[in-house]
């Protein structure tokens, strides 16, 4: 539903933007920029499907769904419970706590999930896309509990649950033009929000923006960081001894995973035993926070505590195991031995630290939209360009304001001359979902601003 903002509402949106996260306001007339964020020219990989491009309004709905604990069977767990913005959208705990215990793998970071040629998701790549991935945790017995097994309700039960919540009827109408909630609509909105999470303001990006290539020395890097970059990029055994070959699997400048990668030799399982199925890695961006501290342990089992531990693992792969990536083996069928010196290890760690950004941890468009009591306080409806219709002249002039609502649901119609103080009038959508209000608008009066809004039922 391609709604455009009316000028009358634009200024109001600017007024409340800074308070959105604190006050629980979702303003569909003044949307955060999800769809047209700046992307460096050197970033070229993109797994966004043609039938689900990121839109500001779709990602806004996705943000609400991502943070809403009502998507779990007992209202205690949301997507954000395991993917926390302040920790690069991963979990500080090794195993995340769901509605029925703890997860079998560590929570994967959600940084730059869009910017990869690998479309599959989860550590074991069992989801075919971000869309497919987005509702699988909801349908997991341990994570969010709508599995339809072991006495759990089904996803259909969740859809029934959400469909009975008026604020979701309002939001889905604002985004899709009707209050109907389906798994596909949820998947599309969640995927748009997740794909919008991007981080391109790191020290690496500052250097790459003025360099002719990744291989060139970056002017803002230290000698150690540039040395680490070269080790990362160059394959083993090349000129001058070569490098480490990290980029063979983790490809610069996106630092996404090569879709043809096997497992990396870390085959432990949080539940005990061995797990050879983990072939997917998140982007290597934002491995650590701005201070260089890990968000938590690395790998699917969080078994490596520091970046140096990670480097040591690849320096000496423990054994050739089932599914080990061939690039981590040496003939004849032996595990990789890089024989790195300590200064070389330190330079690799220094380089990996340069991949951490800044804004992704604090930007409010990726933050919790609910207020302090985990509720939304106001939803401002989108208005089409023909929503205002004037009739009459002079003191007899009137304006009719229309919008699309949920049939028979109560809204408020608001007017303001300063976008600070609003006068509200009750307005109920018709059986057909039409919202219509006609008010006096004398030409001699100051400019007036109009909007429809919905106050969620507690």
What annotation goes with each model-predicted range?
Residues 2, 21-383, 433-439, 458:
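Periplasmic c-type cytochrome electron-transfer domains
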Residues 1-9:
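Bacterial N-terminal signal peptides that target proteins for export
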Residues 8-18:
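Bacterial N-terminal signal peptides
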Residues 12-13, 82, 249, 451:
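General secretory precursor processing signal
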Residues 379-458:
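Short, composition-biased motifs enriched in small/polar/acidic residues
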């Amino acid at each position: 539903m391609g709604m455009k903002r009316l000028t009358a509402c634009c200024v109001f949106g600017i007024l409340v933007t800074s308070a959105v996260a604190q006050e629980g306001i979702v303003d569909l007339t003044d949307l955060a920029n999800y769809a047209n964020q700046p992307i460096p020219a050197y970033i070229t990989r993109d797994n966004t499907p043609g039938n689900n491009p990121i839109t500001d309004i779709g990602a806004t709905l996705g943000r609400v769904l991502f943070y809403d604990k009502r998507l779990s069977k007992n209202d205690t767990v949301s997507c954000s419970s395991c993917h926390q913005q302040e920790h690069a959208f991963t979990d500080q705990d090794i195993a995340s706590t769901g509605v029925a215990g703890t997860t079998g793998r560590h929570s994967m970071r959600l940084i730059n999930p869009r910017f990869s040629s690998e479309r599959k998701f989860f550590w074991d790549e069992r989801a075919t896309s971000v869309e497919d991935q987005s509702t699988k945790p909801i349908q997991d017995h341990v994570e969010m509990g709508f599995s339809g097994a072991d006495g759990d309700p089904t996803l259909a039960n969740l859809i029934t649950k959400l469909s009975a919540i008026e604020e979701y009827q309002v939001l889905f109408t604002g985004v899709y033009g009707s209050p109907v909630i389906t798994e596909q609509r949820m998947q599309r909105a969640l995927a748009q929000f997740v794909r919008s999470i991007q981080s391109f303001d790191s020290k690496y990006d500052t250097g790459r923006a003025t360099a002719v290539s990744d291989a060139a020395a970056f002017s803002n890097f230290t000698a150690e960081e540039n040395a680490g970059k070269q080790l990362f990029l160059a394959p083993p055994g090349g000129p001058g001894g070569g490098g480490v070959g990290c980029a063979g699997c983790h490809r610069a400048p996106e630092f996404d995973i090569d879709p043809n990668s096997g497992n990396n030799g870390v085959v432990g399982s949080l539940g005990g035993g061995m797990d050879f199925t983990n072939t997917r890695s998140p982007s290597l961006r934002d491995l650590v926070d701005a201070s260089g501290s890990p968000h938590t342990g690395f790998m699917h089992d969080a078994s490596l505590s520091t970046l140096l531990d990670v480097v040591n693992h690849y320096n000496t792969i423990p054994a050739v195991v089932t599914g080990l990536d061939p690039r981590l083996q040496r003939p004849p069928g032996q595990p990789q031995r890089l024989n790195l010196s300590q200064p070389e290890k330190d330079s690799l760690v220094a380089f990996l630290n340069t991949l951490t950004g800044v804004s992704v941890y604090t930007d409010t468009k990726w933050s919790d939209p609910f207020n302090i009591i985990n509720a939304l306080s106001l939803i401002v409806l989108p208005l089409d360009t023909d929503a205002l219709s004037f009739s009459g002249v002079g003191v007899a002039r009137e304006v009719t304001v229309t919008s699309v609502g949920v049939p028979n649901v109560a809204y408020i119609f608001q007017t303001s001359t300063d976008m600070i103080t609003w006068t509200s009038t009750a307005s109920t959508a018709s059986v057909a979902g039409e919202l219509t209000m006609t008010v006096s608008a004398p030409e001699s009066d100051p400019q007036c601003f109009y909007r429809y809004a919905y106050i969620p039922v507690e």
